[in-house]
Amino acid sequence: ILCSYIDNIIAKRKVTKLTSDFVICDRWVNDILIDLGAECRINNILESKWYDRFHTIIPSNTFQFIVIRNIDDILNCRVENNTNPDFQYRFDLYNKLASKSNVHVIDNTGSIENSVMQILRIIE
């Protein structure tokens, strides 16, 4: 965990030097924690000191999104998840993350255009 934490601190320093208005990271702090929680079966990872510490890395003006989909759609789209022993645990952790007040939930059951519009409404 400590190595991932340090790696993310370095990544944050790189991001803060950029001059663009938005930086989009597909996988970052929450994904690292959920991967760790799923692989090590740490059910309370999102309520842990590590969650709090990792979130100190995130700049204060950051929007955090979680894109949700129906579990059957995910399993049909990525068949490897059907045999992944961590999948259900990871899926449950993402659902827990979606209930956090600092996370914006994007419903991805419709078109990609619909998902993009949901994000734009939040950041504008």
Segments the model singles out, each with a brief description of its role:
Residues I1-R41, I45:
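ATP-dependent small-molecule kinase phosphotransfer cores
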Residues T19-S20, N61, S101:
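Short, well-ordered alpha-helix to beta-strand connector turns
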